[in-house]
Design a protein with these regions (language model features):
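Active/ligand-binding-proximal structured segments within catalytic/core domains
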Residues: 36-52, 76-127, 372-373
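Short beta-strand
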Residues: 59-60, 116-120, 212-213, 330-334, ...
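Functional cores that coordinate and move charged inorganic groups
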Residues: 89, 108-218
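Hydrophobic helix-and-loop "lid/oligomerization" segment in the mid-to-C-terminal part
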Residues: 242-337
Length: 398
């Protein structure tokens, strides 16, 4: 059994402990101590990390009554070692977890929304709510949560028998829990059963910042950050806005308007380019058809190679080539280190593009698929891809 010192003192940064066992597995060397300051991953909170006897400890997990610590090197059984926390990581995790309690209490108190899911990743924290809230409502909850932080309220841990829980005003009660339960309380605020580590006062959280929310099942998923993570995230995004402003030659507050104007200009240019491309293909298609192979029944077979071409442009040219209904055509175009192709057969032809696509895939070292009158695929780029297009025209006719 491992004594969990972090349950009584979340501010304890180190301790002396005796190595009870050490065994190698896929994750590293699994070390069990008689006591530990390291919180094992659980309850939505990330594992602590640090060192054991100077050896890097990267992950801790609870197995039964023991906490298993994964180290990069083995530790001698029976030896006393110093367990030292990566304190910055612990503080980051405490800020996120305590912030989650306070934000969850805010949406519950203000709007009756329940937190039904909590996840903490590296620089990403989410809660899932069982009802939808608007951006304005979330902003109100964010303001309320931050007011709880700035009032610097005490956060306390207590242990109570489960029979006393009905007397507490808790946002979430799990009636399946029995025995002595660990209760985390924010003064005049959230009360919740919790196994995690928390700062001593709300002021240590510093800040809660909601970044986004999305529809999730019958409610929403709220993405947020607290403390140092929130500060660094805001600093990074602020730099993005300043960079965008410099590129647009305007102040940061003008960036949204500048981007809208730029988007309108790009849309207009794309429409003009699309119109010019259509005109070009009106001229190019007859030239390509004039060079097409023709069988005894009058069906034309043509394969065109296009260097600078988008997928949409390739389809446009293909449609121009197929306009008479008696043509089998392929448009092959380069996209970076890939060669792509679109195949089509007119309604008055007997050609099956599925079969032609298999042949084209073999020719270009790739694959594709489709239906009788249209298919598409691609393969790897090679220097002789234009010569292969000439071969493809012959394959279309066979």
């Amino acid at each position: 059994m491992t004594e969990k010192l972090y349950e009584q003192d979340s501010m304890l940064k180190s301790c002396l402990a005796t190595v009870l066992s050490c065994a190698e597995d896929k994750r590293g060397y699994a070390v069990v101590l008689d006591r530990t300051v390291f919180f094992p991953e659980g309850g939505g909170q990330l594992s602590d990390r640090g060192t054991l006897g100077g050896v890097k400890m990267t992950y801790a997990v609870q197995r039964g009554s023991e906490v298993v610590h994964y180290c990069e090197r083995p530790l001698p059984v029976g030896e006393q070692v110093e367990a030292v926390l990566d304190w910055q990581a612990r503080l980051d995790h405490m800020q996120q977890h305590a912030g989650e309690h306070i934000l969850s209490h805010a949406v519950w108190k203000l709007f009756g929304a329940n937190n039904i899911g909590f996840h903490m990743g590296e620089r990403l924290v989410t809660i899932d709510l069982d009802k939808e809230l608007t951006a304005a409502e979330l902003a109100q909850a964010e303001d309320y949560a931050n007011s709880q932080i700035w009032e610097d309220k005490p956060i306390t841990v207590s242990y109570l028998p489960h029979t006393e829980l009905p007397a507490l005003v808790m946002r979430k009660k799990n009636e399946k829990l029995t025995g002595t339960l660990r209760i985390v309380t924010v003064a005049d605020g959230d009360i919740c059963t919790c196994c995690g580590t928390h700062p001593l006062r709300t002021g240590m959280i510093g800040l809660i910042r909601i970044n986004r929310f999305d529809k999730h099942k019958d409610g929403i998923r709220v993405e947020f950050l607290c403390g140092r993570w929130a500060l660094e995230d805001a600093r990074r995004k602020n730099e993005y806005v300043w960079q965008a402003g410099r590129l647009l030659s305007m102040k940061p507050e003008g960036v949204p308007q500048g981007l809208r104007k730029l988007q309108e200009e790009v849309t207009e240019l794309n429409e003009r380019l699309k119109a010019q491309t259509a005109k070009l293909y009106e001229f190019l298609a007859p030239q390509l058809l004039a060079q097409a192979a023709v069988d005894e029944g009058g069906t034309k077979y043509v394969a065109a190679a296009q260097e600078d071409c988008s997928a949409a442009d390739a389809r446009l040219l293909l449609n121009k080539l197929l306009a008479d209904g008696r043509t089998v055509a392929a448009v092959v175009y380069r996209s970076g280190e890939r060669i792509n192709f679109v195949l089509g057969s007119g309604e008055q032809t007997q050609a099956d593009c599925r079969s032609l696509c298999r042949k084209a895939g073999e020719l270009f070292g790739g694959r594709g698929g489709g239906a009788q009158h249209f298919a598409q695929g691609g393969g790897a780029y090679s220097d002789d891809w234009r010569q292969k297009v000439l071969q493809l025209q012959q394959l279309l006719k066979e």
